[in-house]
């Protein structure tokens, strides 16, 4: 999704032999493969919390040998990963946020509301609470907060009332029952807007289960710090909460923070980042026609223009 634009955005920073680029969201390795192909002198470090994704992408990237280093890690662990690898600074960082197509297409992971599956939704299935556990154990007020904050679901109270009523009869295990419950709970008018009525609830549960926003909140500033001066970072996000967070970090880095009235701006107040996109760039109609999952994508890019001081 918008891969070509991401590569073009990172290109000026990845021409030098030995440049290091980080793919923070490896998935099935499509972006990593494209980075290795496009920048034959670059080395790749790629992260994923999903062990199955690492196995499959490892096979895909095997022809690139020692140029690719794959690491089982969450992307907010980037500073630790680079430290372990002895890489002080990198020249490029790419994030493609959201669920990989593999996770969406694998029925037994429970990410998709279009097919019945166990309510799991963990990107790393070896750790943490599943979506079913969240639904069955969280207090009603907490569930309402999650649906509102992470799903921007206006009918959160109505949905949670139905969930609490149903879970007392029998705990939730599968996605189809939840989808049906949401359909039944929503007023007719709410069902007419924006696709499957379960979409927002599933998004909210996925974000909660994987701690996505809190991880991202730590990951983007950490990625900015790991980029050398002249290095670049590109972020593809898929909903407004992610995009807003990326926008805030980039805008803060690109701001002049000097107190008003100074005749000369000392370096510690000067911007650390230069924005590379005007607002968020959207996918083209062709990209959406080719892959409908690209429709909500938003791309932002920034270049590191000075070191942090003090």
Swiss-Prot record:
Its main location: cytoplasm. It is an enzyme of class 2 (transferase). One of its GO terms (molecular function) is rRNA (cytosine-N4-)-methyltransferase activity. GO terms for biological process: rRNA base methylation. One of its GO terms (cellular component) is cytoplasm. Its EC number is 2.1.1.199. It catalyses: cytidine(1402) in 16S rRNA + S-adenosyl-L-methionine = N(4)-methylcytidine(1402) in 16S rRNA + S-adenosyl-L-homocysteine + H(+). Keywords: Cytoplasm, Methyltransferase, rRNA processing, S-adenosyl-L-methionine, Transferase. S-adenosyl-L-methionine binds at residues 29-31, 48, 75, 96, 103. It is found in: Cytoplasm. The keyword Cytoplasm applies. Specifically methylates the N4 position of cytidine in position 1402 (C1402) of 16S rRNA. NCBIfam families: 16S rRNA (cytosine(1402)-N(4))-methyltransferase RsmH. Belongs to the methyltransferase superfamily. RsmH family. This is Ribosomal RNA small subunit methyltransferase H.
């Amino acid at each position: 999704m918008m891969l070509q634009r991401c590569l073009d955005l990172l290109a000026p920073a990845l021409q030098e032999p030995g440049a290091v680029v980080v793919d923070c969201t490896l998935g099935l390795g499509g972006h990593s493969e494209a980075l290795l192909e496009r920048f034959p002198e670059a080395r790749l470090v790629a992260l994923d919390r999903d062990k199955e994704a690492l196995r499959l992408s490892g096979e895909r990237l095997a022809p690139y040998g020692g140029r690719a280093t794959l690491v089982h890690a969450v992307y907010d662990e980037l500073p630790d990963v680079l430290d372990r690898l002895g890489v002080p600074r990198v020249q490029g960082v790419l994030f493609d946020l959201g669920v990989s197509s593999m996770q969406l297409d694998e029925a037994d992971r429970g990410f998709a509301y279009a097919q019945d599956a166990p309510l799991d939704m963990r990107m790393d299935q070896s750790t943490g609470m599943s979506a079913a556990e969240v639904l069955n154990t969280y207090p009603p007020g907490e569930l309402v907060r999650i649906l509102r904050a992470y799903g921007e679901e206006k009918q959160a109270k109505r949905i949670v009332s139905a969930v609490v009523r149903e879970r007392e009869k029998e705990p939730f295990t599968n996605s189809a029952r939840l989808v049906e419950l949401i359909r039944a709970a929503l007023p007719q008018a709410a069902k007419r807007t924006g696709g499957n009525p379960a979409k927002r609830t599933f998004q909210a549960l996925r974000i909660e289960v994987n701690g996505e926003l809190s991880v991202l909140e730590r990951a983007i500033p950490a990625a900015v710090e790991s980029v050398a001066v002249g290095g670049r970072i590109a972020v593809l996000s898929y909903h407004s909460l992610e995009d807003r967070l990326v926008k805030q970090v980039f805008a803060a880095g690109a701001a002049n923070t000097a107190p008003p009235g100074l005749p000369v701006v000392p370096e510690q107040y000067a911007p650390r980042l230069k924005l590379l996109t005007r607002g968020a760039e959207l996918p083209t109609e062709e990209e959406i026609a080719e892959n409908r999952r690209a429709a909500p994508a938003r791309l932002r890019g920034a270049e590191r223009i000075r070191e942090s001081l003090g």
